[in-house]
Amino acid sequence: VTGASDPNAADADGEKKVNLGDRKTATIEVKNPKKWFPDTPNLYMVTLELKDSTGKVIEAEAEHVGFREIYKVNINDAEQEQMQITGQKIIFRGVNRHDASLENGSAVTNQEIIDDLKLMKQYNVNAVRTSHYPNAKILYDLADELGIYVYAEANVESHYGAYGDHKVPIPGGDSRWVTPVLDRNMNMLELLKNHASIIGWSYGNEATYTRCPLDNTYCFWAAAMAVLNRDPSRLRMYERESDGYYHRYQKDAGADPWGMETRSKNIVDVHSTQYPEAKNVESYAKNTNYKLPYFEQEYAHAMGQSFGSFNE
């Protein structure tokens, strides 16, 4: 422990204090912590206290954190990749979630969020994508506690406004939108970075419809690099830049798919699609030309008739 009065690491049932004095940063090594998994969402409480010169506490903050490691590995001679959490394969059984209340429209109450996530857990849903904007903090707190993976999505969505035939595509590949897109992505990341349930960042939804240059004039490339440099511990996703669209994934033979050398060449870490048929998913998995692990971003839209024709 850097600058600490007690170098012993805490266990799940214990408590240790770090006295930093005038120091502003600290590194704490926790030995053999209980890991966070969806089935065993072990959490630790981190408490920070700010004291004045007399030792009086003038501000205190507390937040849960969990210990788990997200990464990708090559799984065969073709170097196709797999997402893993602390050595175990990740399989998503997930849903997209919008803030939607029968009584209040988009102004959902805390209790409605609690009911949503408890219902998901009861029906073996283990993942949620916050389509298409950051949610209230209680959702991420509950996901930490209940053991639900979260793909956190930034508030960037424009649909037809992103088409290149517009005078000013929004944002599309127009470099004038780099700063706003970066701002929305990094604000989300800084707000939510301590949540164990968040395993990946999504830069936005359906906001590009043309092939854009992979450089900092393209807002989603700029977001990808900023997110990677600030938080290389999580997966990155943007469905409009999936491997199947432009075939732009780059990885040297034998390279570590989770290494910064590989990831800094690429805008996403996973392949994601919308509304595929089952045969298309199978075809992607069997095609050894595709390397990225697969994330089915959207499948059956419930707007309007609420799955009324799902069977058909």
Give the role of each language-model region.
Residues 127-312:
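Substrate-binding/catalytic cleft of secreted carbohydrate-active enzymes
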